[in-house]
Design a protein with these regions (language model features):
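Conserved GNAT acetyl-CoA-binding A-motif
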Residues: 120-131
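Active-site acidic-Proline motif in GNAT/NAT acetyltransferases
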Residues: 100-102, 106, 134-135
Length: 183
């Protein structure tokens, strides 16, 4: 189905995008976030994000293409221990933003960020922060095009428990980016 939707003639090549539903993640979506095993190691991270969503700490979004499934995701942390990222009132933190490779460069990522921004404005937030790997030039370009600005450097050090409950340490130097949003 995916290749049929994408690889048709030029005028029909992106008709699938009109069928994409951007909605809140539900529990049954969690296995699809593993992308056929590529992100299996993040299973506990996703489950914890879902639990935090149930406590009102996170807002989790997916892009769902009927008859294909979840093809994108973006998570928002409303309140963090690090108040410079998400303070619960003014600033929210965007993370775990992914679009499956075959659906990139189609406008879907921009559309998802637009949905997130509108939702955060309704919640009276005024700023979105994110960290992006310094080596991820395509993502940096997307964020800059969407109005985010680099405001600092982050060490990008964090840890998580993988699907085997083994502690994994990550070191991925990142740029901290910020965008002001308003009504």
């Amino acid at each position: 189905m995916k290749s049929e939707l994408i690889h048709t003639n030029q005028s029909e090549s992106f008709l699938w995008i009109n069928k994409v539903i951007i909605r809140h993640l539900i529990f049954s979506d969690l296995p699809q976030l593993e992308w056929n095993g590529e992100y299996q190691h993040l299973r506990q991270v996703y489950l914890n994000a879902y639990k935090n969503r149930n406590q009102g700490k996170n807002v989790l979004w997916v892009a769902d293409l009927p008859q294909v499934g979840v093809i994108g995701q973006v998570f928002i942390q409303l309140n963090s221990v690090r108040k410079d990222l998400a303070d619960g009132f003014f600033s929210a933190y965007l993370y775990a933003f992914r679009i499956k490779p075959e659906f990139r460069n189609t406008g879907l990522g921009s559309r998802m960020i637009g949905v997130v921004e509108k939702d955060l404005v309704k919640r009276n937030f005024r700023e979105i922060t994110l960290n992006v790997a310094k080596t991820n030039n395509r993502a940096i370009h997307l964020y800059e095009r969407l109005g985010f600005e680099i405001v600092g450097s982050e060490p990008g050090e964090w840890s998580y428990r993988d699907h085997n409950n083994k502690l994994q340490n990550v070191s991925e130097p990142a740029w901290k980016m910020v965008k002001s949003i308003s009504k």
